[in-house]
Amino acid sequence: DLMPYETSLEGRSDYLAAADKTESLSFALPFDKNQNEDPLFARYVVAVNRGGVYEPVSNEAYVTNPEVTSDYQEPFPEAQTKKGLNIELSMLDDAMSLGVKHTAINISVREFLDPNGALTYDYNGKTYRFNKSRVEEYDKTIRMFSNKGIIITGMILNGWNTSHPELLYPGVKETGTSQYYMFNTSTPEGFETCRAVMAFLAERYNGSDPNYGQVSN
């Protein structure tokens, strides 16, 4: 298996399963989503040992049905109409009068991931801090939209972040023309912080707590 920050099998001598040469083969691997290197994020490749060096002989493949491992198995909500509109909380009454049942919310990681934040979240053995007041603003907006039966799509944005530079791809430089940047999963540190942020959002806004509401996409 190869994690997102691994680019090749060079130097690797470990493997998840082994089989003798045959016309076809299949592997069954144990799954533990609580392990440090979550297998859902890995890509898998078949390799052969040639002179002590493992060489790939297949394409790389990902797990194609990760949803079956989710703790949250509620059905996707059905909207009463197809009508959608990008709205702010102050526009909610107008949106309801128009029959709006879909909207998108920009979720800026830079705004709520705060090393001095009062809201803590433990993930994979590490504690992350979030800006409590900013998160509560998201809570209010998402809750009020959800309570009106509006299906929410979250647009997760990665702005320039000097407090968490690991979220930025190595070598990228801040520009005056770019507001947002690609999330970095090419390093272990960036990958871990990205995992933590996405896990926090998924746990908070999965709809199980009415105080937070639900982001469906």
Where are these regions (language model features)?
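Short linear motifs in intrinsically disordered
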Residues: N34-E37, D71-E78, L119-Y123
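Boundary/entry segment of secreted carbohydrate-active catalytic domains
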Residues: P30, F41, Y54-V109
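Beta-strand-enriched, solvent-exposed domains that form extended recognition/catalytic surfaces
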Residues: D1-D71
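Proline-rich intrinsically disordered, low-complexity coils
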Residues: P4, P30, P39, P56, ...
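Residue-identity detector for glutamine
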Residues: Q35, Q73, Q80, Q179-M182, ...
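Substrate-binding cleft and catalytic face of glycoside hydrolase catalytic domains
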Residues: L98-N217
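Extra-cytoplasmic beta-strand recognition segments
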Residues: F27, L85, I150
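Solvent-exposed loop and beta-edge segments used for protein-protein assembly and interaction
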Residues: K21, N36-L40, P77-A79, S146, ...
